[in-house]
Amino acid sequence: MKRFLCGVLAALMLVVLCACGKQETATVRLSEVTHSVFYAPQYVALEQGFFADEGLNIELTNGGGADKVMTAVLTGQADIGLAGPEACIYVYNQGKDDYPVVFGQLTKRDGSFLVGREDVPFSWELLRGKTVIGGRAGGVPEMTLEYVMRQNGVVPGTDATVDTTVQFNMMAGAFTGGNGDFVTLFEPTATEVAQAGKGYILASIGQESGEIPYTAYFASQAYISDHADIVQRFTNAIARAQKWIAEHDAAQTAEIIAPQFPDMSVPVLTQVVQRYKDIDAWNATPVMTRSSLERLETVMETAGVLDHADWVDFDRLVDNSYAHNAS
């Protein structure tokens, strides 16, 4: 009898220990700037269960632009935002105390492609005297486009017109509707326009721009402070996905993320993933470097939206501790 009771007690203790060791599931409301193959590592983390392994339930919404993602984070409608870190710079320079802080980087160059109306050998000189639908003024896509144009001797506003009046998620529709001569589009939209016979992919903006912290994860300081464990678990999942995508080819990646893009065939999705692999779009780890942030601020200064005196110190805007712990 005594031996039986000891066995029962041991079993109960094992159950209690297992229950104590089990991680509580937490829900994270994540607002992404757009739903694009450009963010493939994030979808790998979702589809491979990397977030679930960290005890996280992700509620993903499409913010439809960096400004809208930032608004969602600032108003508490989203816990974490995925957008260009320029949004954090703008908020910091507005003097807000609880300005959002970047804790992880996903992409390291522009993920948009220049789409034109004719299938011709591309030269930036083709833009002279033409109109390019470039996105919202002050957004990283528009600023990077202008930076690349200047780098190639085409001055926006003088040699070519950059239309900044069209909302980010309306750019493809505006172009296929007859506006502009060129447009910058992310995947899968660029390929969808090309497949519809409404345009031709001519150039990669990111290949021309060099490395910048194009898309990153950020949250309010209050959220990070109150939910440090969740932020670490989130970053762990992203780091694991970045490693996974580096070790697998485009076809394998396309198979995994296909549920996120139900309107695309796997062969076309494979082609799109390969296009991003070819331009080295994704970070190897979530760590952001000081030099890359400074290049972004250079792009912003060149675009006329940031004075040099208003550059934000790296250590104020970026907390790499979670990324280092995850990598």
Model-derived features with residue positions:
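Short, low-complexity disordered leader/linker segments with a strong preference
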Residues: 1-27, 325-327
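Conserved C-terminal helix/tail region of periplasmic/extracytoplasmic solute-binding proteins
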Residues: 297-327
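Residues within well-ordered alpha helices
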Residues: 44, 50, 148, 192, ...
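Secondary-structure end/capping motifs
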Residues: 225-307
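Short, charged helix-to-loop "capping" segments that act as catalytic/coupling loops
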Residues: 36, 93-99, 137, 155-159, ...
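Short amphipathic alpha-helical segments at helix boundaries and their inter-helical linkers
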Residues: 78-81, 176, 276-290, 321-327
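Pocket-lining segment of extracytoplasmic ligand-binding domains
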Residues: 87, 167-261
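Short, glycine-/small- and polar/acidic-enriched structural segments
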Residues: 26-167, 174, 181-187, 198, ...
